[in-house]
Amino acid sequence: MVVNIEYLDLMHFDDERYIQILLDIFQYKYSKPKPDLIIPVFNSAVALVLKHGPDLFPGVPIVFGGVESKFVENRSLGPNVTGYLTDNNYTGTLDLALNLHPDTRHVAVVAGAGPIGRGWSKACREAFKAYEERVDFTYLIGLPLEALLEKLANLSAHTVVFSLPVLQDGAGKNFIGNESLSQITRVSSAPVYSFRDVNIGTGIVGGYMSSFEEDGKAVAQLGLRILNGEQPEDIPITRAPTFLYMFDWRQLKRWSIAEDKLPQGSIIKFKQLTIWDMY
């Protein structure tokens, strides 16, 4: 099996000229022979393939991943499309943080200036409306990183931080992976929580998390079913079945959170075993 990976970088370049260049490249590379399967991941790539796929790759099955239910609502997906939805559970992580810090009165929500950050912060704000009588929310969205770090270093008491991706800041600076999150957790005067397992190890306490690895496996299984002869229209769009409570042991110690306060079945990463644990 030959797998070709195309990194579109639509987060940083999304103008019409750039998109046309991408389409021309795909036409040149994949018109003959056509691929047997296309797997776009995350909103920008999925939107591009759904819009232009029928012209570029007529009849080629599409299995998408990394998008929420709202993304596909009211979209005409076509008969050769199926996929795997991952609905981010913002309230699960917020409930967790409020339970572990019962004296919380303020929640600072952090997100970047790019399309991913803006989209997720909008969904997050909508999800958190039900909590507005319980705690005050401050939305730190699209700030230059230096300004964001200054605010996080001087948060009021009884605050927790809910971090969404900061892949681009308000000054136009781009960040790779968890680069910005590591800086956020290092300076924050309050514990930081998030909702994706790939964020564990950056200095966040933890969260009620979905797994990139499990999502990838699920998308791959759908793709294999199609390559083995099933038709996309016969495979229902699937939703992520489970979320996991996951924590960084080092941050539990940093913020004096007792392990017996964690939900049953929690996964604790980076735990340093004592001699009693080992023997």
Residue ranges and their predicted role:
Residues M1-M278:
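Short hydrophobic alpha-helices and adjacent helix-cap/hinge residues
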